[in-house]
């Protein structure tokens, strides 16, 4: 009997536990999310370590800034002590407060994303921090906290510290063939299945540049594996001589196509209309795109993760604008002014339009 597809597994999840997760970055069954978080909490508890220097800096910022101290405490207080927000029958929250949050971050900073043979999905993949913050993100104080410029400067440092670990040889331990390794029977099968997109039946090593005879298939780190190269002949460019054809920049799934885009719009409201001025950071170039079409896609967790130019041409300007990391729109949380919503369990999906701006 063959391994079930991701969609078949999702279809078998009871409705009350099912969450739509674009790109499979978080499991479709919220029970898997809770189980994973329980494991991280237990691991961090049984093997406590001194806080990473960047987290000591974060703790100092929280405790020496009255505004941030108020918001971080309030966002945990605002999580309802009822299902599905609590994990146990007496209403205890899984992540209790900001010291507990930092303790879990501390564990994450020295661990790479593991493969999961869970029946309902592939585990947390690249969003374990999002999983830890899932509930506080959707509270009114969480909304303010994750928009705060000082908080986001600190979160950037935290994520960069994790990035350094993921680029180190120590992170390659998850590239084994055991049940938590990405080259386990199910892991390598699902990676190849995704890359074959239902049209071919190539093996992983036939699709991607690697050496199966070497340890970890020759990949030196988690980052080396995650940004693996594909064999050129497996992804020919569509109509390279025809300028009317725009290729996908990466192996992404369509999220939204919007036409007749306004120069500026209320991107934070339900429906998440695109706002060119804010998307392009006030750059005068926005004027060229008013009334045009925006195509937004979502990259799958299992897909090929290198980017290619969607059109031919010459890059004349490029820049990076710092923004927010875990901000989600209020209409998807208990902060919804209408009072009709609980905290969104799939914020990384429902906030996709909103996060095209997030550069405050």
Where are the predicted features?
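Intrinsically disordered, low-structural-confidence terminal and linker regions
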Residues: 1-69
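Extended, domain-scale alpha-helical bundle/helix-rich regions
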Residues: 76, 80-265
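Short, glycine/small-residue-enriched coil/turn segments at secondary-structure junctions
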Residues: 237-251, 300-323, 335, 352-357
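Short helix/loop capping segments that flank catalytic or ligand/cofactor-binding pockets
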Residues: 255-258, 263-265, 306-308, 318-319, ...
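Cytosolic, membrane-proximal regulatory domains of ion/volume homeostasis and mechanosensation machinery
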Residues: 264-294, 319-360
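Cleft-lining beta-strand/loop regions that shape enzyme active-site pockets
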Residues: 297
């Amino acid at each position: 009997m063959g391994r079930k597809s991701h969609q078949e597994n999702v279809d078998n999840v009871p409705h009350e536990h099912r969450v739509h997760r674009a790109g499979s970055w978080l499991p479709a069954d919220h029970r898997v999310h809770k189980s994973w978080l329980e494991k991280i909490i237990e691991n961090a508890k049984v093997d406590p370590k001194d806080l990473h220097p960047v987290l000591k800096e974060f703790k100092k910022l929280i405790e020496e800034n009255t505004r941030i101290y108020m918001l971080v405490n309030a966002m945990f207080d605002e999580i309802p002590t009822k299902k599905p927000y609590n994990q146990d029958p007496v209403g205890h929250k899984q992540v209790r407060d900001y010291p507990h949050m930092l303790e879990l971050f501390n564990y994450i900073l020295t661990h790479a994303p593991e493969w999961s043979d869970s029946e309902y999905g592939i585990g947390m993949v690249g969003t374990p921090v999002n999983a830890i913050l899932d509930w506080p993100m959707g509270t009114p104080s969480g909304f303010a906290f994750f928009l705060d410029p000082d908080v986001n400067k600190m979160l950037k440092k935290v994520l960069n510290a994790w990035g350094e670990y993921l680029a180190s040889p120590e992170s390659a331990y998850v590239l084994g063939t055991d049940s938590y390794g990405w080259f386990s029977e199910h892991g390598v099968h699902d990676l190849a299945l995704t890359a074959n997109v239902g049209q071919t039946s190539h093996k992983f090593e036939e699709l991607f540049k690697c050496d199966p005879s070497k340890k970890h298939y020759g990949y030196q780190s988690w980052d080396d594996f995650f940004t693996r190269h594909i064999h050129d002949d497996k992804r020919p460019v569509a109509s390279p001589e025809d300028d009317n054809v725009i290729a996908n920049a990466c192996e992404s799934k369509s999220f939204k196509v919007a036409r007749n885009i306004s120069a500026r719009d209320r991107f934070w409201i339900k429906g998440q209309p695109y706002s060119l001025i804010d998307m392009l950071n006030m750059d005068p170039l926005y004027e060229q795109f008013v009334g045009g079409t925006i195509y937004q896609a979502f990259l799958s967790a299992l897909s090929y993760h290198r980017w290619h130019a969607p059109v031919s041409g010459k890059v004349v300007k490029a820049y990076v604008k710092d923004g927010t990391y875990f901000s989600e729109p209020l209409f998807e949380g208990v902060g919804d002014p209408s009072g009709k919503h609980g905290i969104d369990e799939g914020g990384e999906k429902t906030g996709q339009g909103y996060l095209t701006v997030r550069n405050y």
